[in-house]
């Protein structure tokens, strides 16, 4: 069996293989995490924003994010206004799961 490698000069992402080999994750979750890791550090993460770069809808992206949260690859912290209402989420994305 032969292996084909692409010459990586520009526009590629270096990331850990950990999540790609994690048997607990669905292919959808692995793909979404890979996509999230390819985004710039200052990207404004949101469920709606993540749907812009893929074919999946909001519900599909939401279930993948919840799966990644369950396994420690994503943490979302609620951001509240002065009235205590949730106005946003801060995302922390990890290449390897955290407890």
Where are these predicted regions, by residue range?
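Winged helix-turn-helix DNA-binding recognition segment
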Residues: 19-31, 36-91
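Short, Lys/Arg-enriched N-terminal segment that forms or immediately precedes the first helix
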Residues: 9-23
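Charged low-complexity intrinsically disordered patches
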Residues: 93-99
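N-terminal leader segment of winged-helix/HTH proteins
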Residues: 1-10
